[in-house]
C-alpha cells in the first residue's frame, strides 16, 4: 500500500483506521492524504515460497482534518508552514479582505500501521483485515494488522533482536535492542485487547511489544525516560528491551518518529489504584479501629520509589531554575479561581496567600518529571513498586511534556489521586 493513486485502497485504509480503537479523530471530518511504506522486513522473493512467512513492513498514514467547508487555496508560502496547531478563532487581522479568508493548512496526524501481507485469506485473521489490492511487488494480496498476526510479530521481533537497519531511497527502519533483552522471537504473541491509544502484544510472560499508533515526531518520551532510568540502574521501572525508529519523507521533509518499544512484562503486578481501593474496603469492613491506613506502608514505599526516580532524572536530563514570583502569581490565580467557584475555601485564602508570597524572592529548581503521575501509573509487584507511562500529560505538546518542571507536580498529582 502506498501513495494515494488508488482511491479504493485509500478508502479501505481510512475505513480501517477510523474504526480502530486507537484512532483519535472520531467525530471529526478526516481526509486521507498519503500512505508511505517503510522498507520490507522480509525478502520479497520469499513471499512466493510455499509456507513462507508473510510479507511485513511498517507504513505511515498521513491524515488531515479540514474545515467543514473547503477554504480558499492557500498561498505557497503559507502551505509550507510547519505549525500543525489548530487555527485560533476570532483573531484580529490587518490583511486586505481577499487575504483575510486564507487560513492555515488543516492539522495533520501520522498513524503507524504494522502490516502483514498474505496472498490468500487467513481464517484466524478476519478481524485484522485492512485492505485487499494488487501490490506492485507481491501481486494480489490481503493486508492484515501485523499486531494480530503471530507470524508477523515474530518477523518484527527477529528484526529487533538482530539490530537491523533497513533502508530504501526515501525511508528507513531502525531496530535497537538493549544489551540485555530478556525475550526471544519464539515467545507466543498475544494481542492485548484492552488498550485504547496504542496496541500492545504480550510476548509470553516476559515482555510486551507496544506499537505506537498516532505518532509524535521525534523521540518518544516513554522510551527516552526508560532508557535513562535503566542506564542509571533504577529498579522502580520496567526494563526497556528495545525500540524501533522510522524515517520517511512527507512534503519534501524528512520526518522521524519512534514506532514501537519492547518492555519488560511485570509478573504478579497489581494496579496501584485498585490496590489502594481494596485497602480502604478492607479497612472499612474491619471491626477494628485503626489509626493508620493499611495502605500507609505502601504509600511510603511508593514515595521512596518516586524520589529515586526524581534523583535519577535530575542526573540524566537538563535542569534549570525558574522565578518563584512567576510560580506564586500562577498559584495565587488558581487559588482565587478555586475560592470563587467554591466560596467555602475563602477562609483559607489569606494563609495560602502568605505561603505563596514567600516564593516571590526564591529561585525554584526544575527538572524532568513524570508529568502525569497518579495511582493508575503505578504497579505493585512482589519486588516492590514500579512506575510506568512516562509520556506525560496527553493534552500537552511534546515540548511542554519534555520541559523541566517541579518535582512537586508529581507529588501533588499522587496526593490528588
Predicted regions mapped to residue ranges:
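Intrinsically disordered, low-complexity proline-rich tandem-repeat tracts
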Residues: 71-73, 85-87
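Short Lys/Arg-enriched alpha/beta "domain-start" segment
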Residues: 2-44
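Conserved ATP-binding subdomain of kinase catalytic cores across diverse folds
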Residues: 56-60, 65-70, 97, 102-334, ...
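Catalytic-loop of the protein kinase fold
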Residues: 368-371, 375
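Basic polycationic patches enriched in arginine
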Residues: 78-81, 101
